[in-house]
Amino acid sequence: MFASLPFILTALGITQIVSYGTMLYGISVLAMPMAVDLGWSSTFIYLGFSVSLLVGGIVAKPAARFLERRGGRLTLTIGSLVGSFGLFMLSQTRDQVVYVAAWIVLGLASRLTLYDAAFATLVEFYGLRARRPISILTLFGGLASTIFWPICHYANEAIGWRGAWLVCAASVLVLCTPLHMLMPRHGVVMENGPGENGASPDPEPLVPAEAKSQAILLLGIAFAANAFISTALSAHFIPAVVTMGVSAATAMWIASLRGVFQTLGRFLEMLFGKNLDPFMFANISTGIMVVAFAPLAAGGASTPALLAFSVLFGISLGLITIVRGAVPLVLFGRHGYAGVLASLATPGLIATAAAPTAYAYVLDMWGPVVGFWLMFLVAVMSFGATLALAWRFRKGTS
């Protein structure tokens, strides 16, 4: 039972919802109550979160090496224990040193528990057959904010922000730790997995070993650019379009469509993307982002333009998450997969940490139209990187 694909996917899906919901999304709800109660600026509160992202980038490669040596079960279990301790530290913080230390702990935990570690665990068990399970797993992760934003909100209302962080810590400890411990042990290869016979040999990677660094560089540029866009707009989209003349209520409900279409994009990939050329898949996911920004970069802030943006933006983000997990597997093979994800994650985490402050500066200095032009150009850079990847390495595969 515990070694079956349905159990593994369900267990990892639950733990991704809980881990993302607590370690990444909880701060969105609890930042202001913390700032008011502790007397700290919201800038400092979010600085702690940025420190977590930077730490995640620093420890990404050591964490990947540990996973490759000791396996996903031990890595994920340790990550859950570390994560619950970091969340507990947040609930007890009364000075700034402890607060920053808590985020440092959570930065380490995130590299041991979130998508990259879960993707690598699936590849450990299923090899190249993990592509479809990776796509399915991303559907679970898309629910994290939908579930944990209300949990954190109502917990804060009922028992305060400290109690809310304790709820987060308990969720990780009680739900994630035992589910991770039930994963198959290191070295086990699942014979009955998705798609093909478990005994069949893996096909040759599409990217030859001597060109691996070049391909990783191009993918890293694409992922870092998209991480910058996603994080910057998560923080600033609503106030930016309000300054363009849109009501706050309209901006709010339009922005909320992003999550719905992010999940829809992942679901469509599951239905129609099984045999899609990985280079084409990457081009489509980043190309949609370029199209999404075109009307906003031109200064359009009408409701139809904003609706079209949210729909296309959400679909693009949903697809890019799958690209991040599945395409490297096809391009580079299963061997060293965790290390490849770590190499791809590091620049993206740095971009994510810098994005809110950098984009706020652009908006303050030049306004939202220039800000959307910047996002449009960053999207073009991402699309250009995937086009260059396809031009350099496509071998007529499907």
Model regions: which residues?
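Hydrophobic core of transmembrane alpha-helices in multi-pass small-molecule transporters
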Residues: I17, V97-T113, A224, A305-G318
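Extracytoplasmic gate region of multi-pass secondary transporters
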Residues: I27-A31, K212-F267
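Intracellular juxtamembrane helix-capping segments at the cytosolic ends
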Residues: M34, L112-Y126, L319-F332
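Interfacial helix-cap and linker-helix signal at transmembrane-aqueous boundaries
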Residues: M34-A35, F66-L67, P150-I159, V241-V242, ...
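Helix-to-loop junctions at the C-terminal end of transmembrane segments
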Residues: I58-G71, G265-D277, L363-D364
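C-terminal ends and interior cores of transmembrane alpha-helices
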Residues: L81-R94, I288-G300
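Helix-loop-helix hairpin linking two adjacent transmembrane segments in secondary transporters
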Residues: F140-G187
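C-terminal transmembrane helical hairpin of 12-TM major facilitator-type secondary transporters
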Residues: N275-V327
